[in-house]
Amino acid sequence: MANLLGLEVKKIVETTPEEIEKVQNWINSEEYKEQNFARQALVINPAHACQPLGAQLAAHGFEGTLPFVHGSQGCASYYRSTLNRHFREPAPAVSDAMTEDGAVFGGQNNLHEGLENAVALYKPKMIAVFTSCMPEVIGDDLTAFIKNARSKGHVPKDMPVPFANTPSFNGTHIHGYDSMLLSILQNLTEGKQVEGRCTGKLNLIAGCDFNTADYREYKRIMKEFGVPLTVLADISDSFDSPCNGTYSIYAGGTPLEDASDSINGKATMTLGPYATPKTFGWIKDNYAGKHVSLPMPMGIEKTDAMIMKVAELFCKEVPQSLKDERGRAVDAMTDAQQYMHGKKFAVYGDPDYLVGYVSFLLEMGAHPYQIVCSRGSKKLEKELQGLLDGSMYGKGCKIYMNKDLWHLRSLIMTDPVDAMIGDSHGKFAARDAGIPLFRFGFPVFDRVNMHRYPRIGYQGVIYMVTQICNKFLDSKDETCEDRFFELMR
């Protein structure tokens, strides 16, 4: 970079303030943005994590389930620490600690010994196995390894041991979540479908959602409806259990019996279609009842769609309590719309979150001006463009598929916005641009208790409106001249 500006490459302690300022000004320029967007072989700070992280999240969503990493200990520590830092809760998982000999001779012995130790020490009801890079590169055969482990008595013959291939060098955390969830459901429901039997329940798949409050909100809404519910991969208690003097490795999770019987449910609804395409495709071919795929219910319109579909599936009237809740959400939007109207936002994150952010912002009269997804698809781009085209506030907004947070920095420095929505990794770009960052995504490392507030449903609307508008008002109070510092806003 220094060479491109005609500067001598020096140690930072030898660099003058003038030279530093020259580089800073250049990386904020249109010229640099063009070069930044021209790069192809390099990714800088992508807005996603790796497959095994999502696989571990899915495993935590089931009762008595021990996540088991077939791979190196260091990889397992990364997945655990990332979840721990986001939720500020333990994220128990084990690893068979493959090293150099496993890389040469294969990891079967590591897996067998690890499974035997896990059963003896942690006494799980189910072990969910997923892989890191090393066993994927050498081609370890998990089907054969686990079959051999059963035949040799390393794990009880009746203990479910679903597994997923989750190479870190391909896909993202949402793909790992999808693969692990699919494997768990295939394993638990095998041979459990009964002709003519119907549990009368709604099976709900929330997608790769890292907000525990969202799961509780789904359960509360269905309780208002009087609809019996099975949440497939329920992390609400796994990562938000009470501090009451006791600790369990296996707090919460969907009961295995309920998950096994979910194949006989009345209907199955996925609210994270971009996070669970393989799982939902298999469910449509194998599960009884009706199958519905809807966007994550962020904002009024998407929440309405979920509410009306549940009412249709179960032939129920929408409860008055939910109608009142909707009215309060609309009232909150009306009270606050003048503080968001016309504001420009840069948004980034997982596909399902992006659809939700964009829908919500358009409803508030704001502009989702720059939309960045690090692993997007043509289908996602088409859906987002449809949302933009359907609103006057989408005019001039642009979608950037398969771009990273360094691309996003160039965008907000050359074409400024009023705020960003995403996760903690965007704080550096937000600081450089001098704008607020609203941490509604994953991971959130630098704020506390964010996962305890819903983003979905009518309550989610009220929460996001409140957070965003009050921050704008705070900023106005902090930066205005004394003569404009008023009691009323």
What is the role of each PLM region?
Residues M1-R489:
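An N-terminal assembly and electron-transfer interface module characteristic of large anaerobic redox
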